[in-house]
From Swiss-Prot:
Function in brief: Snake phospholipase A2 homolog that lacks enzymatic activity. May display myotoxin activity. In isolated heart decreases cardiac frequency. Also decreases mean arterial pressure. Does not show antimicrobial activity. Does not change renal parameters (such as perfusion pressure, renal vascular resistance, urinary flow, glomerular filtration rate and sodium tubular transport).
GO CC terms, sorted: extracellular region
Gene3D superfamilies per UniProt: Phospholipase A2 domain
Recorded GO MF terms: phospholipase A2 activity; toxin activity
Name assigned to this protein: Phospholipase A2 homolog BmarPLA2
Length: 33
């Protein structure tokens, strides 16, 4: 879900998902696995 993805991005980058989501949005599958 978006919430889980946001939490993962927040933990990985340590920044707000809103800013990093654009960059990691395409690579969410790679980070998810």
């Amino acid at each position: 879900s978006l919430l889980e993805l946001g939490k993962m991005i927040l933990q990985e980058t340590g920044k707000m998902p809103s800013k990093s989501y654009g960059a990691y949005g395409c690579n969410c599958g790679v980070l998810g696995r």
